[in-house]
From Swiss-Prot:
Reaction(s) catalysed by this chain's protein: 5-amino-1-(5-phospho-beta-D-ribosyl)imidazole + S-adenosyl-L-methionine = 4-amino-2-methyl-5-(phosphooxymethyl)pyrimidine + CO + 5'-deoxyadenosine + formate + L-methionine + 3 H(+)
Enzymatic class: lyase
Function: Catalyzes the synthesis of the hydroxymethylpyrimidine phosphate (HMP-P) moiety of thiamine from aminoimidazole ribotide (AIR) in a radical S-adenosyl-L-methionine (SAM)-dependent reaction.
Molecular function per GO: 4 iron, 4 sulfur cluster binding; carbon-carbon lyase activity; zinc ion binding
Positions with a binding annotation for Zn(2+): 269, 333
Cofactor(s) demanded: [4Fe-4S] cluster
Associated pathway: Cofactor biosynthesis; thiamine diphosphate biosynthesis
Protein name as it appears in the record: Phosphomethylpyrimidine synthase
Organism encoding this protein: Thermotoga neapolitana (strain ATCC 49049 / DSM 4359 / NBRC 107923 / NS-E)
Known EC number: 4.1.99.17
Binding site for [4Fe-4S] cluster: 408, 411, 415
Ligand binding (substrate): 66, 95, 124, 163, 185-187, 226-229, 265, 292
Record-level GO BP terms: thiamine biosynthetic process; thiamine diphosphate biosynthetic process
Free-text comment on the cofactor: Binds 1 [4Fe-4S] cluster per subunit. The cluster is coordinated with 3 cysteines and an exchangeable S-adenosyl-L-methionine.
């Protein structure tokens, strides 16, 4: 049975117990939210996930870290290190988005080593296979769409981004739009190119029931990808974006009817004043479905510091109801990220998630904030470091410029906490 099937039958899985303990909530709340489709617990039947996560209404905001190879940079060892570092610094899940090398070996290696859920975008494999055969990247068959989904499922992938909302009607609207950047989703562009070349409807949309059957067999959580998401803040919140959203909203109901877990992916470039509207509209159209946002970035001028822009947008999005944040690294829009970029990206998005949790009144988040306050009051540096999202950096800076007494070298003998303690 799938996690949703079990939840609807009143059965509590081991994974449900684990996430309930982590969240500090009653397991019945976990079971009920999964049964209603307001939360998902990504867990392929073939993947041993020792650190499962629950994504959705009423639970802590989660962070995903993308890793994966590209042409000229296809070291499995580097990707393993990226995965290790991402998990060490708090990533709740990984997505393997490789486009070069032995894609299946890389994917299987990461799934095997990962204690957290692993996601992917199967359509990439179809395009890469065609390119490596010296063909056009969209020169593959309709059968390849589903063969790749099955291959990823067999490899233990827990959740998949499927750009099912890229329909002929949506595509026609985009072609005739005034968008500066027509399509920036790689998966969306591949499918759109295939549709135009073959003058056909999107197979994922046309044969959605077949996709659901595969997902149910392996208990894959479907993340309905927004292939028409805006690629610039000046293109945000246009009719093309919302046309696709409404298509995906209809498909959410069909997935729930088949007892397949489903999420909605949202835009990655959104002005700050439009974040609330976008998140709330997605929640409404998706009838409370978990929301997975790529960022979002509230400015496109932060190249080299996109992880900071991402944290700003992500914190606000999380506060307004986004459940799952995909990190952005300092290398976004510039190059393939290295291990250090992955670390910086995870920390930035974890900060955004924690900020949102505190603002939403998450009990566990508030307990941790209280522990930090008490540690600062007591000059308990080790506890402060342990509670910090950037523990290594915090400890390194403290040790580089030490102070021999209580407090730190910022204030020295003029420490406000120490003075207040002495004269109170």
């Amino acid at each position: 049975m799938t996690q949703m099937e079990m939840a609807r039958k009143g059965i509590v899985s081991e994974e449900m117990k684990k996430v309930a303990e982590y969240e500090g909530v009653d397991v019945e709340e976990v079971r009920q939210k999964i049964a209603e489709g307001r939360a998902v617990l990504p867990k392929n039947k073939l993947h041993r996930v020792s650190k499962p996560m629950i994504v959705g209404e009423g639970f802590s905001v989660k962070v995903n870290a993308n890793i994966g190879t590209s042409q000229g940079f296809s070291s499995i060892e580097e990707e393993k290190e990226k995965a290790r570092v991402a998990i060490e610094y708090g990533a709740d899940s990984l997505m393997v988005l490789s486009t070069w090398g032995d894609l299946r070996e890389i994917r299987r290696t990461i799934v095997e080593m990962s204690p957290v859920p692993v996601g992917s975008v199967p359509i990439y494999d179809s395009a890469v296979k065609s390119y490596q055969m010296k063909k056009n990247v969209v020169d593959f068959s309709e059968k390849d769409f589903f063969d790749m989904v099955i291959a990823h499922a067999e490899d233990g992938i827990d959740f998949m981004t499927i750009h099912v909302g890229v329909t002929r009607r949506v595509l026609e609207r985009v072609k005739n739009s005034k968008r500066i950047l027509k399509i920036v989703s790689r998966g969306g562009a591949i499918i759109a190119g295939w549709m135009i070349k073959n003058n056909r409807e999107n197979p994922f949309y046309e044969h959605f029931d077949e996709l659901l059957d595969i997902a149910k067999e392996y208990d894959i959580t479907l993340s309905l990808g927004d292939g028409m998401r805006p690629g610039a803040v000046v293109d945000a919140s246009d009719s093309q974006q919302f046309e696709e959203l409404f298509v995906m909203g209809e498909l959410v109901e069909r997935a729930r009817e088949k007892e397949v877990q489903v999420m909605l992916e949202g835009p990655g470039h959104v002005p700050l004043n439009e974040v609330e509207m976008n998140v709330k509209l997605m929640k409404k159209v998706g009838k409370g479905v978990p929301i997975f946002l790529l960022g979002p970035l509230p400015t496109d001028r932060a190249m080299g510091y996109d992880h900071i822009a991402c944290a700003i947008g992500g914190a606000l999005a999380g506060y307004y109801g986004a459940d799952f944040l995909c990190y952005v690294t300092p290398s976004e829009h510039i190059s393939l990220p290295d291990v250090e970029d992955v670390r910086e990206g995870v920390i930035a998005s974890k900060i955004a998630a924690v900020v949102a949790d505190v603002a939403r009144g998450n009990r566990k988040a508030w307990e941790l904030e209280k522990r930090m306050a008490l540690a600062r009051k007591n000059f308990d540096w080790e506890t402060m470091f342990d509670l910090s999202l950037g523990r290594d950096i915090a400890k390194k800076k403290y040790e580089e410029r030490p102070y021999p007494d209580k407090g730190c070298s910022m204030c020295g003998p003029f420490c406000a906490i120490k003075i207040a303690e002495e004269f109170s």
